[in-house]
């Protein structure tokens, strides 16, 4: 008797592994977004402490450009809003992947439970 798993079980295992990889990628993406959000919020906090006529600069690629406080505050707040939206999107993706993972895990358990025992 062959020790190989049936094609259906192999397929389910491959799908589980793929979902695990997707979940790990989402965790990394979520961490990166959270970090960017914290940086933007910290910049907003520092700008709030500054007088309105303060000279500020912002990074644009390899350049630092002069800007005014109000414009920079608006840009930073929009960035935080966008990052919040991205975090919500990632959270929904995580939920879908987790749900699919649990469903597939149950199917796999059922498939393995129906396999004939290996005898010797």
Swiss-Prot record:
Superkingdom per UniProt: Archaea
Function: Molecular chaperone capable of stabilizing a range of proteins. Seems to fulfill an ATP-independent, HSP70-like function in archaeal de novo protein folding.
HAMAP family the UniProt entry points to: PfdB
Any single Gene Ontology cellular-component annotation: cytoplasm
Name listed for the protein in its UniProt record: Prefoldin subunit beta
Membership in a protein family: Belongs to the prefoldin subunit beta family.
InterPro entries: PFD_beta-like, PfdB, Prefoldin
Compartmental location: Cytoplasm
UniProt subunit comment: Heterohexamer of two alpha and four beta subunits.
UniProt keyword Transcription regulation, yes or no: no
Organism: Methanothrix thermoacetophila (strain DSM 6194 / JCM 14653 / NBRC 101360 / PT) (Methanosaeta thermophila)
